[in-house]
Amino acid sequence: MWTIIAESILGNGDKAVQWYKMLTPIEHARTKESANKYKVEPYVISADIYGTQNLAGTGGWTWYTGSSSWYFIAGIQYILGLKIEHNVMSINPCIPKDWDGFSIRYKFCESIYNIKVANISRSNSETVKVVLNGEKIENKIPLDGSGKIYNIEVEI
């Protein structure tokens, strides 16, 4: 998890997502053969994946790890770049260069935030423009729970 976060902080979206996919449990159980080798639940983050001799590729310690929460943080806060601190949202993605972008629908109390990120520069990171309901703003969006709908466009 720490490598994913570090690669994101360094602006290496291609590597961050490569590591993210490597740790995704389902990637180790896509076929019957790989599932038989993995031997643990394909829906739970494994604390260990053995790498020696006849145990290579076998997962372990699936329900004893806090890794799933860090996996969530790595994906949402560092790759997709959605961070909320003190009821203020910022969006600083670090995604692969070949991604066109992505969208997020975030609900805060009764308000809806429709977020669309466009990777127009084909870079891994560096948010260049944030538009809230048609108006260019700084990348600090105060959250309110008034029931309004907010449309946010982010360009990297």
For every predicted segment, state its role:
Residues 2-156:
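Non-catalytic C-terminal accessory modules of carbohydrate-active enzymes
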